[in-house]
């Protein structure tokens, strides 16, 4: 998740250098952003594969057949998508950042991914008094 975001673009570039297809969950409204990223990185639809879905839905809104099709094809799930806008409502932040992360973990389990990588901001730690080490 988050392939078209600031960090995601750099991660996708590095993953593509490994020579294996990269699957990117992308909102239907962001498919053009993924096309632009393909152009920038010299990727094709076969090397940078769009998985249109919704972070807020179970299995990202994919059908059981679509989930089954992805089993065994994805070893690592990288979850970068989040709402960082502090002006966003608490409900919107919860749906994206809490429920979305839960959905990403469950999706990784559903497709049999062996590794789940979550990238977030320091805000994910909540209120903390002290020094992060």
Give the ranges of each region predicted by the language model.
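Residues at the starts of beta-strands that form the adenosine-phosphate
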Residues: 20-21, 47, 114-115
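Short, conserved SAM-binding/catalytic segment
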Residues: 32-45
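Conserved Rossmann-fold cofactor-binding substructure of NAD(P)-dependent oxidoreductases
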Residues: 42-76
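Conserved glycine-rich Rossmann-like NAD(P)H-binding loop of the short-chain dehydrogenase/reductase
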Residues: 18-32, 120
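Glycine-rich, N-terminal phosphate-binding loop of Rossmann-like dinucleotide-binding domains
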Residues: 26, 80-81
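N-terminal Rossmann NAD(P)H-binding glycine-rich loop of SDR-like oxidoreductase domains
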Residues: 1-20, 24
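Flexible cofactor-recognition loop at the NAD(P)H-binding site
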Residues: 5, 82-83
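Conserved Rossmann-fold NAD(P)-dependent oxidoreductase catalytic core, especially the SDR/UDP-sugar
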Residues: 76-80, 87-95, 99-133
């Amino acid at each position: 998740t988050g392939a078209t975001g600031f960090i995601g673009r750099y991660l996708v570039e590095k993953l593509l250098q490994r020579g294996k297809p990269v699957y990117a969950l992308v909102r239907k409204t962001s498919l053009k952003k993924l096309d632009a990223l393909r152009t920038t990185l010299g990727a094709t639809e076969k090397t940078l594969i769009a998985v249109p879905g919704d972070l807020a839905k179970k299995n990202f809104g994919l059908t059981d057949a679509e989930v089954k099709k992805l089993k065994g094809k994805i070893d690592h799930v990288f979850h970068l998508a989040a709402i960082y806008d502090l002006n966003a409502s608490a409900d919107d932040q919860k749906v994206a950042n809490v429920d979305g992360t839960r959905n990403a973990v469950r999706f990784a389990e559903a497709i049999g991914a062996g590794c789940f990588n979550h990238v977030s901001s320091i805000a994910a730690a909540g209120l903390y008094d002290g020094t992060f080490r």
